[in-house]
Amino acid sequence: MSDTATPLAPSGVFSVPGKDGDPSLREWLALLKPRVISLVVFTGAAGMAVAPRWPSIPIGLITILCICIGAGAAGAINMWYDRDIDAIMKRTVVRPIPDGRMPEQAALVYGVVLSVLSVIVLWLATNALAADILAFSIFFYSVIYTMWLKRSTPQNIVIGGAAGAFPPMIGWAATMNSMAVLPVAMFAIVFLWTPPHFWSLSLYACKDYGKAGIPMLPVVKGARHTRWQILIYTFILTAVSLVPSFVHEVGLTYTVVTSLLDLGFILCAFRVLMDKQDAEGVSLTKDKPARFAFRYSLVYLFLLFCGLLVDRVLIG
């Protein structure tokens, strides 16, 4: 399998009108990657909710909307740039651009316009700090991750994970116009959660990534190395997840909930490591442990932030 990235197709290769004429609302929404932004919006709302001072309902809703639109806009730019590799991978071939339901130029303009609007509206409604973090997160995902890291290094997910970790800081900043230990800890949790989450996916989608020339860790370093990295990053994540407890930002509820979730994640990582493998470390069970770990990681992050919200409510 190749460890080099597939070059971007020349402009115009995928410039085709929608199969049934103009793109429908469904196609425009699909460009925003709704499944991805749902978790982003949740963590952003959590960052806002755990702040000492709650925003007014209108400001809170505008903040959540701007995070949603900003994240979706970055996703649209990502789909525009990745249209060549999306057309190769089974998991992404049905996306609007490679499937011929969306002209590529329209997707790019759509992403850029929504990016600018989300930042301007958030700045006008809240403050410059929140808008600046949102703008940087969009730039980080659209340019640094999508246009550089994704196709150039197996550490793409490790570094690129920062893009999806900013929303808690945005939510907090929109409310407080400042930064503190807790939102930074929330950023670190999401940042360190990203590698084991996506590497679990990449284990069972390895052939797809290799076919597209994306240097994901299993493609470049092999499945066995990836399994060890999942375990290592899971241990680091579980340690960092308890930082809010160590600095006395949370109470017993968060500590207990997170400790139980951490134990579950560690067990998942060990199962991935001990999966039945051939001589090259390729799973003989169709990567069932990795598939379970991927699903568990989603539940983990959701319940951890829920535990944080409940804890902050209980301690006032």
Swiss-Prot record:
Pathway: Porphyrin-containing compound metabolism; heme O biosynthesis; heme O from protoheme: step 1/1. The keyword Glycoprotein does not apply. It catalyses: heme b + (2E,6E)-farnesyl diphosphate + H2O = Fe(II)-heme o + diphosphate. Its main location: membrane. Keywords: Cell inner membrane, Cell membrane, Heme biosynthesis, Membrane, Transferase, Transmembrane, Transmembrane helix. It is found in: Cell inner membrane. Its EC number is 2.5.1.141. One of its GO terms (biological process) is heme O biosynthetic process. The chain crosses the membrane at residues 28-48, 57-77, 106-126, 129-149, 156-176, 179-199, 230-250, 254-274, 296-316. GO terms for cellular component: plasma membrane. GO terms for molecular function: protoheme IX farnesyltransferase activity. PROSITE patterns: UBIA. It is a multi-pass membrane protein. Belongs to the UbiA prenyltransferase family. Protoheme IX farnesyltransferase subfamily. HAMAP family: CyoE_CtaB. Carbon 2 of the heme B porphyrin ring is defined according to the Fischer nomenclature. Converts heme B (protoheme IX) to heme O by substitution of the vinyl group on carbon 2 of heme B porphyrin ring with a hydroxyethyl farnesyl side group. This is Protoheme IX farnesyltransferase. It comes from Gluconobacter oxydans (strain 621H) (Gluconobacter suboxydans). The lineage of its organism: Bacteria, Pseudomonadati, Pseudomonadota, Alphaproteobacteria, Acetobacterales.
